[in-house]
């Protein structure tokens, strides 16, 4: 059995760790509400953009935007993968990466090449480690990300799609369901799925200034940016929720460990006292 001093050192070490996990749990709990508010604030814009896209897609025009055209053969697939910058969030990132690799494998089996754009330090490190072709990356967005921080990496994938270098683009992120549940999501970004741009049947007739191609190009790009931005906000909320749950579990485990070590310490102390008494009694009997 370990000595009393060694056990007390272990107890002190676990207590210090518990202070850290409790602090991280409280910080994450305070950040979840703000993250949820940002999600709710951005949703009306995304919904309005979705409705406009639906109207424009069904409008009477000779111009068909490439974002709406499904390609017959898919030779290269692009992924925009969103992760956290920091760890200590349980299996949030690893579960997402594991499921994504499962989604990628069928494409690779057909001979399709894979390109990846990463948002977040964890995704960047993971895909560099497994040597996937990364064509863009952005990290350290903070707890209040701005759409301007994302435009560069989004443009990389949009340009690749327009130029025919990529035939399909997916958005991969953790969707925030509630504090206890975050769901790995894989949304087709380009070309826009039919359900995304279809509305109730109407013969929409628009006047375009300067022309349909210019207007659609601008609106479609803003819509894609809004989808990625919304996904980033969802992922931030998921990160804080996962970290809060993970740190609470760590704090609970620390409490159990401290209780166990305290019991071991008490037994060791009792054994030491009993031994001392026995030695004293034995010494007295010898005299």
Curated annotation (Swiss-Prot):
Coiled-coil positions: none
Taxonomy, superkingdom: Bacteria
Keywords: ATP synthesis, Cell inner membrane, Cell membrane, CF(1), Hydrogen ion transport, Ion transport, Membrane, Transport
Gene Ontology annotations of biological process type: proton motive force-driven plasma membrane ATP synthesis
Protein topology in the membrane: Peripheral membrane protein
Protein family: Belongs to the ATPase gamma chain family.
Record note on quaternary structure: F-type ATPases have 2 components, CF(1) - the catalytic core - and CF(0) - the membrane proton channel. CF(1) has five subunits: alpha(3), beta(3), gamma(1), delta(1), epsilon(1). CF(0) has three main subunits: a, b and c.
Record function comment: Produces ATP from ADP in the presence of a proton gradient across the membrane. The gamma chain is believed to be important in regulating ATPase activity and the flow of protons through the CF(0) complex.
HAMAP family: ATP_synth_gamma_bact (MF_00815)
Official protein name in the record: ATP synthase gamma chain
Gene: atpG
């Amino acid at each position: 059995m370990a000595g009393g001093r060694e056990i007390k050192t272990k107890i002190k070490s676990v207590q210090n760790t518990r202070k850290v996990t409790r602090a991280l749990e409280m910080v994450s709990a305070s950040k979840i509400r703000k993250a949820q508010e940002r999600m709710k604030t951005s949703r009306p814009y995304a919904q309005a953009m979705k409705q406009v896209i639906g109207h424009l897609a069904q409008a009477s025009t000779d111009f068909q935007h490439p974002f709406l055209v499904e390609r017959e053969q898919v030779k290269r697939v692009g992924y925009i993968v969103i992760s956290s910058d920091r760890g200590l969030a349980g299996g949030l990132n690893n579960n997402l990466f594991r499921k994504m690799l499962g989604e990628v494998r069928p494409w690779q089996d057909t001979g399709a090449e894979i390109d990846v754009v990463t948002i977040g330090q964890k995704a960047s490190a993971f895909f560099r480690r497994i040597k996937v072709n990364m064509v863009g990356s952005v990290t350290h967005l903070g707890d209040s990300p701005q759409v301007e921080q994302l435009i560069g990496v989004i443009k990389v994938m949009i340009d690749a799609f327009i130029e025919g270098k990529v035939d399909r683009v997916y958005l991969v992120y953790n969707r925030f369901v509630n504090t206890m549940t975050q769901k790995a999501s894989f949304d087709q970004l380009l070309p826009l799925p039919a359900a995304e741009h279809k509305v109730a049947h109407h013969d929409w007739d628009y006047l375009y200034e300067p022309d349909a191609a210019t207007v659609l190009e601008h609106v479609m790009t803003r819509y894609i940016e809004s989808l990625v931005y919304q996904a980033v906000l969802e992922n931030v909320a998921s990160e804080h929720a996962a970290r809060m749950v993970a740190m609470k579990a760590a704090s609970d485990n620390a409490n159990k460990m401290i209780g166990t070590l305290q019991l071991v310490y008490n037994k060791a102390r009792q054994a030491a006292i009993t031994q001392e008494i026995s030695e004293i009694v034995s010494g007295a009997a010898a005299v």
